[in-house]
A protein has these predicted regions:
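…; additionally, a secondary subgroup of soluble metalloenzymes is captured
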Residues: 18-283
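Extreme N-terminal basic, low-complexity initiation segments
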Residues: 2-15
Length: 283
């Protein structure tokens, strides 16, 4: 049994710079009377993963040195460190996503973890899933901010985006996607599932990577993305003049002025089900 426990230390937010992860394994007894024990009554081995706990960003290491974490310091001697998962700070998939993909038996090639295909399985009846071999991606509404030297993602996903606003924008955009062989399905406000062959081998960056950073390192090439770059440009023009964004700006909210594709890919075989293997749980 593998449990990926996600927790942030203090108020550090080094999300985009996170390059490596240390995984710790617990082989002891978990008191069933505790909140953690109630989640895992069988007391199987547990792995603890703490995303965003450190980064190469300036000031991070001095900040970590001064942190007082008595509970974590008590816990670490009880755990066994596993091999370090090293990576580049500009990798497309953050380390905690790579670790979870490995635990689930999913492909974990950088930028090609098929998270959207996994999510599509969960909603197979609602979206009339025909085959596990379809290619999927997440489409997330976001706000891009242009400066003199770069374009960065200021907000992803969009905050306070109502379900009705998301549905209205989806209805406006869906016909344009369909012209390019892509079908959109609502998932959450501002976050949709997209099905289309263009996503089969499209490398995409996690929203965790691009939040607050320049888009340049993670923009797919024209060769990789095909008509998607043109489609995104068309959708930006549509969003620029859409009444939903006029209403958002009138109430002081950021407009949704762009899209971000992520989690693209295909499940490795027809028989893979979620979760795989059994016992993987995220808390």
């Amino acid at each position: 049994s593998v449990v990926m426990a996600a927790a942030s230390l203090g108020k550090l937010h080094p999300t985009p710079m996170n390059a490596m992860v240390q995984i710790w394994t617990w082989h002891g007894h978990i008191d069933p009377a505790t909140s953690l024990g109630s989640r895992f009554p069988h007391n199987r081995a547990m792995q603890l993963l703490i995303p965003y706990a450190a980064s190469h960003a300036p000031g991070c290491q001095p900040a970590l040195t001064g942190l007082k974490l008595p509970n974590l310091q008590k816990l670490l001697p009880m755990l066994v460190a596993q091999p370090l998962d090293t990576g580049e700070e500009l990798s497309w998939s953050p380390p905690h996503e790579r670790a979870l993909a490995k635990a689930l038996g999913l492909p974990h090639q950088d930028g090609l973890i098929p998270w959207a295909a996994v999510e599509a399985q969960k909603h197979a009846n609602r979206i009339a899933l025909e085959t596990h071999l379809d290619a999927w991606a997440f489409v997330t509404l976001c706000h891009w901010q242009a400066s003199t030297f770069e374009v960065s993602v200021r907000q992803i996903p969009m905050q306070d985006l109502a379900g009705g606003e998301s549905d209205t924008l989806l209805a406006a955009m869906a016909p344009f996607f369909e012209q390019d062989g892509i079908t959109l399905h609502p998932l959450q406000p501002g976050r949709w599932l997209a099905r289309g062959e263009v996503f089969a081998n499209l490398r995409t960056a996690s929203p965790d990577r691009v939040q607050g950073r320049s888009l340049e390192p993670w923009m797919p090439s024209t060769l990789e993305a095909g008509n998607l770059i043109r489609l995104v440009s068309e959708m930006q023009m549509l969003l620029y003049t859409h009444p939903v964004n006029d209403a958002r700006e009138a109430r002081g909210s950021l407009p949704a002025n762009a899209l971000w594709f992520s989690g693209a890919g295909v499940l490795p075989n027809e028989n893979l089900t979620w979760p795989s293997p059994q016992g993987v749980q995220v808390i």
